[in-house]
Regions:
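Long, intrinsically disordered, low-complexity acidic/Ser/Thr/Pro-rich regions
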Residues: 1-45, 56-57, 108-114, 130, ...
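Beta-propeller domains
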Residues: 37, 43-54, 75-103
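Per-blade loop-tip surfaces of WD-repeat and WD-like beta-propellers in eukaryotic adaptors/scaffolds
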Residues: 46, 86-102, 135-175, 182, ...
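Canonical WD40 repeat/beta-propeller blade segments in eukaryotic WD-repeat proteins
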Residues: 57-66, 110-121, 179-189, 225-232, ...
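Structural hallmark of WD40 beta-propellers
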Residues: 70-75, 125-130, 194-198, 216-218, ...
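Conserved strand-to-loop turn within each blade of WD40 beta-propeller repeats
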Residues: 78-79, 132-135, 200-203, 241-245, ...
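Fungal eukaryote-biased detector of long internal structured cores
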Residues: 96, 105-137, 141-145, 170-172, ...
Length: 439
C-alpha cells in the first residue's frame, strides 16, 4: 500500500506506444535500464476501491503486515496522534466509510497529541509496533494490550539527549517512550530481522539503534537541512537516506559511516528503497552481494535508479609519510584512520573523502512532486503528492538475458570492461536523463 491524498489510483493504460502521455507532457510510457525497458502498466486514475473518512483528523502514515496472526494487519497514524489497528480485509468487505473492528490507541492524544509522522510493525515482534511523532518522541506498543489503559511516563530530563523510559504500570500501552530528538522524526525503518531501528529527523541526523538493547549504535548528519526518508538493504548491511540536501547517502553498518553519496536530484529527496528483487549480473561465488540496486524519488518529479558496486567503493585509508594514500575496497572492511566508536553521531564527512555515485537512469515519472517508491517482484511503484500511483512493469526475462549478453549488447560489454580504478572517488555510471525541473 502507498499513501494517496485524494483517493485516486492509477488505472490501466490504453496505449503501449512509447510516445509521451498527452495528459502529462514530457512524461514517456517507459524508461530504459541496462536490463531493458520498464513499461508503464497503469497511467489513468480510477475511483478507489474503499475510502475511509476520519471525522476529526487526517491519516498521516500507515503500515501493513501480511503475516499478522489475528487479522489486524493495518496500522494507521493520525494528525491528532491517535493510532488504529484494523483488518484490511474487514475494511474492504464493509460498505461504510468508517473504520470497523478497530483497536484504538493514544485516544484523543491522551499520551502524545503531536501528529504521527511514521509508523511500523516490529519484524518478528508478535504484534509489537512503533509510532514516531512530530515532537521527537517514539512510542512502542503491544497490539495485544488494551489501548485504553493509562500510560504515564516521567518528564524528559534532558531534551537534547536520547533517553528511554518504560511506562509506570505493567498493563500500560504504550509500554515505552523513546525520546529521539528535539525536532520531528520524519521517518523510521526496521532492518529485515528487526534487530536495528533507523530514524531520520528534522535535525538532519540519521540515528541507528539496537532495538533489543535500546542503545544508539551510530549515526550522522546530512550535508544540509532535514533528512526525510530512510531504508534498509535486505541483508541489513546498508542504509539509504535522503533529504533536503538533494542527495542520497549510503551508510554501512559494518563501518558505521557514510560509504557513498549520490547526486542527481534537483530538489528534496522524498523516498528511497533498495530493489531486493533485482539480481546482480555478477557474482563472486561466495553468495555475498557484489552489487546493490536502489532507487530514489524526489520533489523534482524524478525517479532515479542507482547501482552500488562493492568493488568500486574505494575510500582512502591513510597516507604514509612521503607516500601516496592507500585504499580499501567495499568488498573488505573499508576502515579509515579511526574506527568510529559505537554510539557516536558524526558530522557530515567531506565529500571528496567519500565515493560519489551517479544514477544509471533519471526519469521524470509524474507531473507532481513524488512522495513514495516501492519495488515488487513484477514492478516498480511510484506515487506523487496528488495521490496518483503508477506501476512500471519490469523487463521480461528474455529481454534481460539478451541485454546481459556482451555479444548482443555492445554498450553493456563496453561498460563491463571499464575499470573501477580509473577514478577512485567516483563510481562509473552513465546517466540516461529525462526532462527535469525544480519545484
Amino acid at each position: 500500500m502507498m499513501n494517496t491524498s485524494n483517493g485516486m489510483i492509477s488505472g490501466p493504460s490504453s496505449s503501449s506506444s512509447p510516445a509521451a502521455n498527452p495528459q502529462s507532457p514530457g512524461i514517456k510510457t517507459y524508461f530504459k535500464t541496462p536490463e531493458g525497458k520498464y513499461k508503464l502498466h497503469y497511467e489513468k486514475t480510477h475511483s478507489s476501491v474503499k475510502s475511509i473518512h476520519f471525522s476529526n483528523s487526517n491519516p498521516m502514515c500507515h503500515a501493513f503486515d501480511p503475516d499478522a496472526k489475528d487479522g489486524h494487519d493495518l496500522l494507521i497514524g493520525l494528525n491528532s496522534g491517535d493510532v488504529y489497528t484494523v483488518s484490511l480485509r474487514q475494511q474492504l468487505q464493509d460498505v461504510s466509510k468508517k473504520l470497523v473492528g478497530a483497536l484504538h490507541y493514544n485516544k484523543d492524544g491522551s499520551v502524545n497529541n503531536s501528529r504521527c509522522t511514521s509508523i511500523s510493525w516490529v519484524p518478528g515482534g508478535d504484534g509489537a509496533f512503533v509510532v514516531a511523532h512530530a515532537d521527537g518522541n517514539l512510542y512502542v506498543y503491544e497490539k495485544n494490550k488494551d489501548g485504553a489503559t493509562d500510560s504515564t511516563f516521567p518528564a524528559i530530563r534532558d531534551p537534547t539527549q536520547f533517553s528511554v523510559d518504560k511506562a509506570k504500570y505493567s498493563k500500560s500501552n504504550p509500554v515505552a517512550r523513546w525520546h529521539i530528538c528535539q525536532g520531528a522524526i520524519n521517518s523510521i525503518a526496521f532492518s529485515n530481522d528487526g534487530a536495528h531501528l533507523a530514524t531520520v529527523g528534522r535535525d538532519g541526523y540519521l540515528r541507528i539503534f539496537d532495538f533489543l538493547t535500546q542503545k544508539l549504535v551510530c549515526g550522522g548528519k546530512s550535508y544540509y537541512g532535514a533528512l526525510l526518508c530512510c531504508s534498509w538493504s535486505m541483508d541489513g548491511k546498508y542504509i539509504l537516506t535522503g533529504g533536503e540536501d538533494d542527495l542520497v547517502q549510503v551508510w554501512s553498518m559494518e563501518d558505521r559511516k557514510v560509504v557513498a553519496w549520490g547526486e542527481g536530484h534537483n530538489s528534496w529527496v522524498s523516498g528511497v528503497a533498495f530493489d531486493s528483487y533485482w539480481s546482480s549480473p555478477n557474482s563472486d561465488g561466495s553468495g555475498e552481494h557484489v552489487m546493490y540496486r536502489f532507487g530514489s524519488v524526489g520533489q523534482d518529479t524524478q525517479l532515479l535508479l542507482w547501482d552500488l558496486e562493492m568493488d568500486e567503493i574505494v575510500v582512502p585509508l591513510r597516507r604514509p609519510p612521503g607516500g601516496s594514500p592507500t585504499y580499501s575496497t567495499g568488498s573488505q572492511s573499508a576502515h579509515w584512520d579511526n574506527v568510529i566508536p559505537v554510539g557516536t553521531l558524526q558530522p557530515a564527512p567531506c565529500k571528496r573523502d567519500v565515493p560519489k555515485l551517479s544514477p544509471i537512469i533519471a526519469h521524470r515519472v509524474h507531473t507532481e512532486p513524488l512522495s513514495g517508491l516501492m519495488f515488487t517482484q513484477e514492478s516498480v511503484v511510484t506515487a506523487c503528492r496528488e495521490g496518483h500511483i503508477k506501476i512500471w512493469t519490469r523487463p521480461s526475462d528474455s529481454e534481460t538475458q539478451s541485454n546481459s549478453c556482451p555479444e548482443a549488447n555492445p554498450t553493456s560489454a563496453l561498460l563491463s570492461t571499464s575499470s573501477p580504478k580509473d577514478n577512485k572517488t567516483s563510481l562509473s555510471s552513465k546517466v540516461i536523463s529525462g526532462s527535469s525541473f525544480k519545484q
